[in-house]
Amino acid sequence: ETYFGFKFHALTTVDGFLTDYVITPANIDDRNAVWDLCDKYRSISIIGDKGYINKRLTPELKSERYIDLLFLKRENSRDNYPKEVRQLLFKVRRRIETSFSQLTEQLNLNKVKSKSMLGFITRTSIKVLAHNISFLINKLMKNDDSMAKIKRLVFG
């Protein structure tokens, strides 16, 4: 059997709803995927992780697509954000990371067992759709205490 590694890059709203995603081979640099991920967007702000830090990427996104790329800077960074901004970014990133955690742990996105590329794409899309449907059901049920409760929907 042959296994292929992949990376899942996604855009989400600040409360965790997945709006778009791109899948790349595991050996591709994260910063290259940003261009594909943001292809149809203009004038948005993206909060990325440290894998997207690059001196050229942030100004290029800003000048070409009017996209602000924000990320938590390293502790020893000279031009770190003010404390209030860092706290806000941390809070938003925590919610976004929860969405990714739910995709991997509850919907097993990291274990897509398929025999073809079409099967891989289909299964991945279904898992993202299941996450978003769970998210919307939680919103409709007023379970919006900052966490989408996928297990609670399924198991009661």
Label the predicted regions:
Residues 88-156:
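Basic, amphipathic alpha-helical segments enriched in Lys/Arg and hydrophobic/aromatic residues
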Residues 1-63, 70, 74:
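Polybasic low-complexity intrinsically disordered regions
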Residues 6-12, 24, 55, 74, ...:
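Generic signature of intrinsically disordered, low-complexity segments enriched in small/polar residues
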Residues 45, 50-118:
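Helix-centered, glycine/charged polyanion-binding patches within enzymatic domains
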Residues 8, 37-39, 85, 107, ...:
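Generic hydrophobic alpha-helical membrane-segment signal
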Residues 27, 32, 54, 76, ...:
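Detector for Asparagine
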Residues 2-4, 17, 37, 48, ...:
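A general marker of short, structured functional hotspots
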